[in-house]
């Protein structure tokens, strides 16, 4: 029985073999996500399959948090993983460290990330869009030198508005060198002083149109000072260049329509304006003719002197009023001049008063300073005298340990005034002391 292995022992041995194999520690796998689940813990559980096989897989929260897209059922992905055995079930599975979308999916991922970035910078804001001129003199067309796009644009402009000069700028629209060529041609067209630029090409896959999703191309369109019409691909195709351009056309033909007016519509408008103007002129002339006929029947035209008699009288009246007005204006200005002269004299008087006030204020300030100086001197002198008095005060003397000796209300200043058995009163700093003389000693004894 010792030769038989338990299921768990065999599973552990197989897991050991997997974990020790260096070729299984970092494996690159391509496949489709299925049975995708995101656990509440943040771990991802899913299968990776192709047409023939399915592998169980998981991705820990730490690795999943670094993903720059949201995985979902059916995504074609590229994985970097470690192969091991899940002992509980006894089946092998992969532990994914890195995941990215495969092929077109990865392109769409890059497209969305760049679109978000440029949107946040304001490159697609409607407020920055320039209007397309209604009657362009020159139109620059940036597209491939051959193909349906240039033919459609050229024929449409010629049929709609042949007055517009077309400047064809042959441009690479596909391939590795196309990006730099598109940018160079946009900057060149912008320097020509044209009215409108059409940037276009025919339809294709996302890979074919990818140059018009390149950040540098989008920024070149956004920074262009000349209005740009984007006509990249078919109606269902969208590129970031469409969002950066001043207007997006579904097709190259529509771009030519947007860029030009229709000559036949313009001709109809001109004919309509001509008809309206002619009708207006005829009506106005008829009204003026009737007005002249009416005036010619007026009685004053039959007696011409009546036309200017009143005007002569009115002229004389105006002349009189003008003279009166001149005289009144003269008197008004003379009166104003007198007032100004009086005001000037008053101003001079006020100026003199102000000067005296300034002088008085200056003298007052000087007097205040002098008084303050004297007061300060008196204060300092008084302070010194108070200090001297305090020094001579008996109270201050007693504070230093001395006492005042009284005998029958007389102050004793000499031992000669004392005899034995005299009753004395000693005044000290904090009270009185009664004392009796027991012996008298003089300094010369």
Swiss-Prot record:
Role according to the record: Bidirectionally degrades single-stranded DNA into large acid-insoluble oligonucleotides, which are then degraded further into small acid-soluble oligonucleotides.
Places the protein is found: Cytoplasm
GO MF term set: exodeoxyribonuclease VII activity; nucleic acid binding
Catalytic activity: Exonucleolytic cleavage in either 5'- to 3'- or 3'- to 5'-direction to yield nucleoside 5'-phosphates
GO cellular component assignments: cytoplasm; exodeoxyribonuclease VII complex
Family: Belongs to the XseA family.
Description of how the protein assembles with itself and partners: Heterooligomer composed of large and small subunits.
EC number: 3.1.11.6
The protein's enzyme class: hydrolase
Metal-binding recorded as keyword: no
Any GO BP: DNA catabolic process
Cysteine disulfide partners in this protein: none
Record keywords, A-Z: Cytoplasm, Exonuclease, Hydrolase, Nuclease
Descriptive protein name: Exodeoxyribonuclease 7 large subunit
Top-level taxon of origin: Bacteria
């Amino acid at each position: 029985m010792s030769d038989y292995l338990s299921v768990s022992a065999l599973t552990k041995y197989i897991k050991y073999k997997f974990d020790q194999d260096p070729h299984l520690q970092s494996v690159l796998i391509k496949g489709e996500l299925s049975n995708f689940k995101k656990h509440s813990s943040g771990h991802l559980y899913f299968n990776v399959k192709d047409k023939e096989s399915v592998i169980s897989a998981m991705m820990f929260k730490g690795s999943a948090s670094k993903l720059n897209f949201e995985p979902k059922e059916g995504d074609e992905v590229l994985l970097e993983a470690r192969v091991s055995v899940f002992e509980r079930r006894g089946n092998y599975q992969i532990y994914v460290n890195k995941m990215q979308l495969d092929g077109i999916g990865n392109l769409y991922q890059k497209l969305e990330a760049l679109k978000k970035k440029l949107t946040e910078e304001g490159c697609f804001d409607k407020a920055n869009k320039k209007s397309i001129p209604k009657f362009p003199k020159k139109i620059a067309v940036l597209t491939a030198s051959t193909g349906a796009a240039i033919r459609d644009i050229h024929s449409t402009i010629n049929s709609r508005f042949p007055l517009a000069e077309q400047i064809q700028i042959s441009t690479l629209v596909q391939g590795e060198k196309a990006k730099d060529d598109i940018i160079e041609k946009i900057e060149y067209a912008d320097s020509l002083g044209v009215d409108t630029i059409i940037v276009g090409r025919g339809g294709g896959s996302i890979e074919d149109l990818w140059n018009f999703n390149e950040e540098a191309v989008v920024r070149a369109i956004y920074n262009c000072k000349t209005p740009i019409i984007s006509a990249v691909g078919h109606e269902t195709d969208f590129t970031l260049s469409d969002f950066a351009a001043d207007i997006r056309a579904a097709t190259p033909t529509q771009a030519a329509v947007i860029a030009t007016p229709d000559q036949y519509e313009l001709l109809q408008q001109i004919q309509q304006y001509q008809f309206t103007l002619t009708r207006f002129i005829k009506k106005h002339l008829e009204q003026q003719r009737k007005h002249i006929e009416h005036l010619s029947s007026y009685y004053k035209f039959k007696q011409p002197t009546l036309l200017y008699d009143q005007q002569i009288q009115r002229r004389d009246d105006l002349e009189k009023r003008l003279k009166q007005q001149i005289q009144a204006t003269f008197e008004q200005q003379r009166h104003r001049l007198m007032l100004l002269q009086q005001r000037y004299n008053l101003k001079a008087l006020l100026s003199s008063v102000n000067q005296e006030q300034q002088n008085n204020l200056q003298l007052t300030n000087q007097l205040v300073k002098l008084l303050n100086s004297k007061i300060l001197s008196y204060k300092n002198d008084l302070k010194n005298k108070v200090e001297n008095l305090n020094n001579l005060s008996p109270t201050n003397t007693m504070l230093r340990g001395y006492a005042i000796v009284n005998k029958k209300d007389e102050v004793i200043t000499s031992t000669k005034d004392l005899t034995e058995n005299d009753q004395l009163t000693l005044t000290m700093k904090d009270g009185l002391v009664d004392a009796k003389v027991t012996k008298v000693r003089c300094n010369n004894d």
